[in-house]
Amino acid sequence: MRSGRRWCGRWLAVLIRDVEVERHGRVDVRVVAGRVAEVGARLGGSGGIDGRGGALLPGLHDHHVHLAALAAEAASVRVGPADVAGPEGLTQALRGGAPGEWVRAVGYHESVAGDLDRAILDRFVADRPVRVQHRSGELWLWNGAALRAAGLDDAGDGRFWRADERLRARTPPTPLDLAGVGRRAAARGITGFTNADPHPAPELRTLLRPLPQRLTILGLDRTAPVKIRLDDLTLPTATDLAARITRARPRPVAVHCVTRVQLFVTLLALDEAGSVSGDRVEHGAVIPTEAVDRLRMLGVTVVTQPHFLVERAAAYEKDVAADDRPHLYRCGTLRAAGVPVAAGTDAPYGTSDPWAVMRAAAGRVGPEGLTPRAALGLFLGAPLAPGGASRTVEPGARADLCLLHVPLREALDDLSANCVRAAFVNGRGISA
């Protein structure tokens, strides 16, 4: 595809011809200085990109992702239920590298080979350091060779819960394929990410600089929400959580809620501290019916992962309490009640393909299902206003754009990344 770029005075100008833009029909779009300058029929100017009638959308924004972990996947062994079967398959996967070299395995779930600890991993692999990450992202499992190599031989059973910061300095650096992450995201029409690590290192923004997408980093960016991660075993009282929320003000908060009790404590705390625009519940894995109106009254956005119901169906059937299953990863009923809803892939702990998330949301049966257009809208909110009004291709708008091969109606029939032709950030193409 020709770039269609030229210089207009000091500013880069891009003309995209014959594209379908919502509320405008088939038009031309001119971009100047990183923003949409004109939308109209047969705009003047030479050259340009021929859109061939494909839809031109605002670029997709993944509202919840863990970018460093996603970039580390290329140097990792996948050992989830879809990748290996049983202790034999796990052992074979872990033995794939050279003896003595560190093995970083990701995506593990107990359905593969049961609960793991140091002794069990040593029976599988003893001649090289092995660390296995649970698919929740919150638990690392190390064998004896890894513990000895890291100077942690006295670390008991080798199970480390939420200890990434402690462990990071004791392991060899993991190569990060940020170029690959950015390239694959661009091919799916993603022009922005919200990184949702609970404790981002101060140097994270510098680390992620190779990505061509626009970045929002929870906790680091002064205008972004502060991430608060809850755990049932160490759950604060509502009053203690309210005090923590108050300390974060005037910034909004993004509270990790994956259980019923975490959600109720969060709602009580927000009621006590007072909610502000931009407050978010991350995941909203279990939202009982009685909590929906409270979310609406507090004005809290839910950033959810409907694809987990597809990816983790067997585990949820086995592990989730029967009275919680009807309330998993709500979408449609939240929207119907006036609760803002957005989606994030939660990659690498879920698929990194937002179109797969859309298909999961649109494919649900009953009141939680969304129309394909509403499913697309899960990724069209502004970075700091997920679940709010969808961004639009209008004069003055930032030129973060997604060009499709086909009109929008056809794209909504498929909800597939195959429909994506190109992505632009500030009017500059970031994919071929």
Predicted regions span which residues?
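Active-site microenvironment of metallo-dependent hydrolases
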Residues: 2-42, 94-98, 174-187, 191-192, ...
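Divalent metal-binding segments
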Residues: 9-209, 222-246, 252-258, 262, ...
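Glycine-centered helix-coil hinge/cap
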Residues: 40, 126, 219-221, 318-325
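Short, well-ordered coil/turn segments that N-cap beta-strands
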Residues: 101, 128, 190-191, 211-216, ...
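Short beta-strand segments
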Residues: 104-107, 217, 343-344, 403
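Flexible loop/turn segments at secondary-structure boundaries
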Residues: 111-113, 139-140, 192-194, 200-204, ...
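Extended hydrophobic/aromatic segments used for targeting, binding, or gating
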Residues: 207-226, 287, 293, 417
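His/Asp/Glu-enriched, well-ordered alpha-helical/loop segment
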Residues: 249-254, 263-279, 283-284, 289, ...
